[in-house]
Amino acid sequence: IWKGLVGSEMCIRDSLGVACGLLFLLNADIALASDDQISNANTAWILTSTALVLFMTLPGLAFFYGGLVRSKNVLSVLMQCFSLACLVSIMWVAFLYSLAFGDGGSLNSYIGGLDNSFLAGLSASSMSGDIPETVFVMFQLTFAIITPALIVGGFAERMKFSSMFIFSFVWMILVYAPICHMVWGGGLLGEMGLMDFAGGTVVHINAGVAALVLAIYLGNRTGFQTVPMPPHNLSMTVAGASMLWVGWFGFNAGSALAADQSAGMAMLVTHIGAASGSLAWMFREWSRSGKPSVLGIVTGMVAGLGTITPASGFVGPMGALVIGTLAGLICYEATQYIKNKINIDDSLDVFPVHGVGGILGTLLTAIFASSQFGGLGMENSISDQFLIQLFGVVFTIIWCTIFTIVAIKVAEIFTGNLRVTNEDEETGVDISSHGESSYN
């Protein structure tokens, strides 16, 4: 009897061991299956990057621009940045995400469709690669938010709020969504092989060109080149610039859409580009004017960051050093040329910093992405890739110019003259447009 009981106990124990082993293997298979669907590490990084990129606009860019304008116009700039963040968010949910990343059918080379309007079909379990699609939607939304906010610097201190609002609504449909789709959403430029890691064309060239067109169309501010218009609060500008620098790590490294080697390299070269751009601008200004300025070093930082953006996922540290240095030097000269030689009042230098920087960075990507120059390598030869990059730059400039003018004309239909009156400009847009003053 005793031997029988012991034998039965051993049999039960062995059976339990086999069962536990099977359960362990089953759970491991389930875990592996889950890992194939979602990467918690990648998701956590893109969530963080999303917050960083939104932080670039609110409050980073708002403070950066706010400090650069005169004290009577600071609230207008903050209001424009804040309201655009809200407007673009609703538009993104309603139809912009669908236009940018949806299937456009016969027009897919240029624009997506409306099948995903109001995020139709999106659920908590929807996936985009190995991250939830909800995270991808939100990440891309932050890029859409900052682009029209950058344009604000081109017409600062002289455009009606109502005109700005309607213009931005139309511009996002006609310019941002199509270019975003063509580069990142499976459209023409991406299929051609254009290399734009984080928005040289989509964000910076678009914003720079639109700002230049608006600056020319609106005309110069009253007193431009005859009345001093110094920044009213450089401390605010430096605070905003610092926020932009930190937020840009999410902008560029987050565009890897993964917490991997590509993101690590993108973060490193982003920092190098910012630092080298700052110093290049500072030394060039120092040699020209005899003094290095705070405004100069932070503007050089933005130029370096904007220029490294399209290249950030493709180049190595030495390439970033060259790109950032060229950004500081060339964008500085572009700023002087536009303001002092051809007398265009791009109020906060959006085109020479972001437009020229985006063009320069997109073209230089073809060179420094090559393994010959320390890059991560590419399929095409340098010459072939350069032609693709050049086509992408020219195409984006032409598209943006044409449809920015269309957006201006549409805004004029609803608001008449886009510009505030001379009296309102003299009083300040804070009081005349918003009935408030930043300093009491």
Question: Residue spans of the language-model regions?
Answer:
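Single conserved hydrophobic/aromatic residue that forms the stacking wall/gate
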Residues: 1-12
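A generic structural signal for short, solvent-exposed coil/turn residues
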Residues: 2-4, 25, 421
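Sec-dependent N-terminal signal peptides
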Residues: 15-20
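C-terminal segment of classical bacterial N-terminal signal peptides
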Residues: 23-30
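Glycine- and aromatic-enriched membrane alpha-helices
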Residues: 30-440
